[in-house]
Amino acid sequence: DIHPERATREELYPWLARRWHSHLETYGVHAYQGMMEGPPYPKAQPNASRRDAYPPEGGRQGSSLSFMQKQHLDPNNVVLGILNPLGATGQGQRNHELGAALASAINDWQIEKWTSKDKRLKASIVVANEDGVTAAAEIRKRAGDPNFAQGLLLSRNVEPLGQRRYWPIYEAAQEIGLPVGVHAFGFGGNPITASGWPSYYIEEMVGHSQCQQTALSSLVLEGVFERFPKLNMVMVEAGFGWAPSLAWRLDKVFDRLRSEVPHLKRKPSEYIRDH
């Protein structure tokens, strides 16, 4: 789980139409998380990165392949690293057309700067997740490309991930035979807890696992895995110790309320086990 960064915003310009250059310089990006350009994340340390992660040649942490190789890939004997770009990548954008352009540019950038230069790295297909049809087209565009290992979604979205607005994404992923990674965090515009915004960074971090449980429950109960039986999901950076108890509780409630979800042919725990 590696988060590559751009040294500058202009680094994406070779893969963006000129209209988006001026748009970004004039208006920036606007996620569903309020009308703000910066990410809705605690600002204690840029990019949630260590201070010694700044590349010696300058730029943001995670923006230098050579420094990543020296500091992380080589000393830790990394055999395979999955790139999961976060931030202003097109996910959670209010302007869906801009989101699609950014996502496509990020995907080309991953190949040009990272995977083509180090075979230990594989990219994730970034998509404009709130526009399911356009996102599915981007996934199909990358079909058969060995640079990509998975599609990429985030756990906090406008709606829970099982909602039908996201189904075209799952259909495309199943079609090309790639799993979909669901990385913690996102730009859905909703509070990160079920009862509002918390006070502390600790609560933010604990909330990742809670949000992934919501996402997984939605995927199961909305019937995503029943509709797409060959789809596989990867829940990223939110732990997994909660999975057995979640599966048990879903089964317990399902035994009493299964008439509400007749589209499910098996127990929730079985879908979780198989997908």
State where each predicted segment sits.
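Helix-coil boundary/capping segments in enzymes
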Residues: 2-275
